């Protein structure tokens, strides 16, 4: 595992965006051989999306031959709802870059048969071989995507019941009213994430410190699904200073020395 300890949220977003651009450009994608990118929603990746848009506008990257798969979507929330993840992605990223609409894959939380929707999503991912890079965030309780505590580490895309803690955390997007937050979501599984060639998780804020500790220094444990990163051959965790507060000083020092070159010019 790589741990990239940075100063603040702005640096986390910049490092993540720069890493994605480097990966896309090194891959040299074409229409026949696109780069497959997994994407999250929520507050954490917003800085990364801002930097990706800026780098695209500066001519440093094109998304013309990039195919995206999003992590999750609420069940029962209309697609046009301001807090649907469909709306979020277009508002904060897709509308500002040159990605063709046919290359965008989002789970349909209003599908008449959600189980079939999840199976088709998995099949479409497999049709591209694999996801080259999956970017994600983490919840206070250590969940990645909507793989809540006690999710199977072999799980695939499916419907999940959201915990009360997750709904309370997400109520900030619904005017603070928990009753407006959907109780169910479709989400890629832990196994789906582990199948990606590379997984990059962004961790920001002191509230995520316990989750980061579980990911880096804890045991592999389905109660902290982020700990599954320890099983991945190419996992990258990009974090800000407040989120490292539960890590041992020597752990942060070790990774800071290892990654000194990669964080230059941020």
From Swiss-Prot:
Annotated active site: 72 (proton acceptor), 141 (for ring-opening step), 143 (proton acceptor), 148 (for ring-opening step)
Keywords, alphabetical: Allosteric enzyme, Carbohydrate metabolism, Hydrolase
SUPFAM superfamilies named among the record's database cross-references: NagB/RpiA/CoA transferase-like (SSF100950)
Regulation: Allosterically activated by N-acetylglucosamine 6-phosphate (GlcNAc6P).
Molecular function via GO: glucosamine-6-phosphate deaminase activity; identical protein binding
Cellular component aspect of the GO annotation: cytoplasm
Pfam families found in the cross-reference section: Glucosamine_iso (PF01182)
Pathway listed: Amino-sugar metabolism; N-acetylneuraminate degradation; D-fructose 6-phosphate from N-acetylneuraminate: step 5/5
Catalytic activity: alpha-D-glucosamine 6-phosphate + H2O = beta-D-fructose 6-phosphate + NH4(+)
Site positions (Part of the allosteric site): 151, 158, 160-161, 254
InterPro entries: Glc/Gal-6P_isomerase, Glucosamine6P_isomerase, Glucosamine6P_isomerase_CS, NagB/RpiA_transferase-like
KW tRNA-binding (keyword) present: no
Record EC number: 3.5.99.6
A GO biological process held by the record: N-acetylneuraminate catabolic process
Subunit-level organization: Homohexamer.
Chain's role: Catalyzes the reversible isomerization-deamination of glucosamine 6-phosphate (GlcN6P) to form fructose 6-phosphate (Fru6P) and ammonium ion.
PANTHER family recorded: GLUCOSAMINE-6-PHOSPHATE ISOMERASE (PTHR11280:SF5)
Family under the similarity heading: Belongs to the glucosamine/galactosamine-6-phosphate isomerase family. NagB subfamily.
Record NCBIfam families: nagB, PRK00443.1-5
Protein name: Glucosamine-6-phosphate deaminase
């Amino acid at each position: 595992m790589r741990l990239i300890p940075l100063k603040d949220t702005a640096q986390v977003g910049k490092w993540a965006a720069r890493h994605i651009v480097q990966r896309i450009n090194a891959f040299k994608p074409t229409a026949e051989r696109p780069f497959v990118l997994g994407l999250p929603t929520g507050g954490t990746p917003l800085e990364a999306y801002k930097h990706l848009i800026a780098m695209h506008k500066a001519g440093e990257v094109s998304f013309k031959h990039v195919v995206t798969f999003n992590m999750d979507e609420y069940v029962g929330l209309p697609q046009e709802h301001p807090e649907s993840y469909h709306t979020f992605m277009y508002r904060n990223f897709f509308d500002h870059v040159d990605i063709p609409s046919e290359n965008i894959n989002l789970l349909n939380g209003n599908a008449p048969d959600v189980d079939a929707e999840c199976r088709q999503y998995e099949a479409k991912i497999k049709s591209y071989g694999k996801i080259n890079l999956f970017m994600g965030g983490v919840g206070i309780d250590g969940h990645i995507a909507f793989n809540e505590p006690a999710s199977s580490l072999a799980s695939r895309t499916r419907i999940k019941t959201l915990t009360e803690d997750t709904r309370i955390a997400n109520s900030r997007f619904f005017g603070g009213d928990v009753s407006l937050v959907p109780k169910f979501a479709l989400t890629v599984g832990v196994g789906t994430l582990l199948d990606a060639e590379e997984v990059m998780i962004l961790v920001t804020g002191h509230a995520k410190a316990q989750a980061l500790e579980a990911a880096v220094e804890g045991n592999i444990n389905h109660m902290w699904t982020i700990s599954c990163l320890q099983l991945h051959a190419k996992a990258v965790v990009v974090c800000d200073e407040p989120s490292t507060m539960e890590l041992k000083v020597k752990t942060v020092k070790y990774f800071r020395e290892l990654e000194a070159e990669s964080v230059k010019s941020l």
